[in-house]
């Protein structure tokens, strides 16, 4: 380990013991991330501080830490792995906001809105580098070099899902939509537990964990799609996916319910990129059974995830149960709001 890494580790661990005698896992990981952000005299400092001032649910980090407690993984390794996945997730959010044009993130201005696209792009890149630095530290402590390959693989798949969305033309199949949804969401839900399992030498769980989180990720994405239409997703623009022609389960469900002539008319408008009739089509979609159909598909996907969960070991099942419950609640809330 290099001298700088040792100094950073010591400073972080001292700060935890000095400021919070019994900090939560979320606080520990958040403080670790803050301790590794650029200092005030460095570029990107203000943008990084703005973004991490509201850390969000930190679902991925807390899942990794819960796994570490249950499976007795080294805490120094686990905290760095949890932070690595969380930082990579945040890098993807910053880049997503640029791509999607979303102006808000966690109730505050998105980085690209407040600081400009160039700063947002470079901050996202910088955080990716930090993520791999933290993963390398975890791998060194746990003597598990495979962690870097896990992080790389999941980053690659997430990026591929995002890139596939750029080619979306509104007439792709449900299979294509679900591939995009799972590739964008599932990898960074899978990584926290997969890394913890690998640290204890459990390589058998990998395939089951992947299947489980792929279905869970699809269900979660459909819930987000429903929330996008009813304005409860935190984005400034209601039905923003429709405006920018982004893949959305509600839009696809609406198309499925149209007759041939109606489908042709909608597809012509959709492909044109015109937003003049956006409110009209939004009203048509909200007045249809599209939200209900999307909800039904979401719950069917959630049922598949529940089935895969039964194949998990008792220890891994204990780790993912809170996450499963959280996503079930998110799906139920989205469905309820969509029916309102």
Residue ranges and their predicted role:
Residues 12, 29, 212, 219, ...:
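Amphipathic alpha-helices that form helix-helix packing interfaces
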Residues 188, 244, 297, 312, ...:
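Alpha-helical, largely C-terminal catalytic domains
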Residues 264-310:
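Mobile late-domain/C-terminal helix-loop "cap" segments
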Residues 149, 207-210, 267, 296, ...:
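Short, charged, amphipathic alpha-helical segments
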Residues 28, 34, 38-263, 328:
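Mg2+-dependent prenyl diphosphate-binding active-site environment of isoprenoid biosynthetic enzymes
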Residues 1-36:
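N-terminal amphipathic/basic leader segments beginning at the initiator methionine
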Residues 17-21, 51, 173, 177-181, ...:
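Non-transmembrane, amphipathic alpha-helical segments
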Residues 3, 315-340:
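Short, amphipathic C-terminal "tail helix"
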């Amino acid at each position: 380990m290099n001298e700088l890494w040792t100094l950073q580790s010591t400073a972080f661990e001292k700060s935890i013991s000095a400021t919070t005698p019994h900090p939560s896992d979320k606080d520990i990981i958040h403080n670790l991330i803050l301790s590794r952000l650029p200092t005030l005299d460095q570029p990107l400092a203000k943008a990084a501080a703005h973004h991490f001032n509201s850390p969000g649910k930190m679902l991925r980090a807390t899942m990794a830490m819960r796994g570490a407690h249950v499976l007795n993984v080294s805490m120094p390794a686990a905290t760095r792995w949890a932070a690595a996945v969380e930082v990579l997730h945040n890098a993807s959010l910053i880049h997503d906001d640029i791509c999607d044009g979303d102006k808000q993130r966690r109730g505050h201005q998105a980085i690209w809105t407040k600081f400009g696209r160039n700063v947002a792009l470079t901050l996202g890149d910088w955080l990716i580098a930090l993520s791999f630095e933290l993963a390398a530290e975890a791998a060194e402590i746990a003597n598990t070099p495979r962690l870097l390959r896990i992080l790389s693989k999941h980053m690659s798949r997430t990026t591929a899902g995002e890139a596939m969305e750029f080619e979306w033309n509104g007439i792709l199949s449900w299979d294509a939509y679900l591939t995009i949804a799972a590739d964008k969401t599932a990898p960074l839900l899978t990584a926290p537990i997969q890394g913890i399992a690998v640290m204890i030498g459990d390589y058998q769980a990998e395939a089951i964990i992947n299947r489980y989180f792929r279905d869970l990720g699809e269900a979660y994405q459909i819930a987000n799609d429903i929330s996008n239409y009813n304005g409860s997703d935190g984005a400034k623009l209601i039905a923003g996916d429709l405006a920018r022609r982004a893949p959305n389960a509600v839009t696809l469900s609406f198309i499925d319910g149209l007759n041939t002539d109606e489908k042709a008319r909608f597809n012509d408008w959709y492909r044109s990129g015109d937003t003049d009739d956006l409110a009209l089509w939004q009203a048509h979609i909200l007045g249809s059974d599209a939200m209900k159909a999307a909800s039904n598909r979401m719950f069917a996907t959630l049922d598949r995830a529940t089935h895969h969960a039964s194949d998990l070991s008792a220890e891994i099942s204990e780790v993912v149960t809170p996450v499963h419950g959280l996503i079930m609640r998110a799906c139920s809330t989205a469905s309820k709001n969509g029916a309102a």
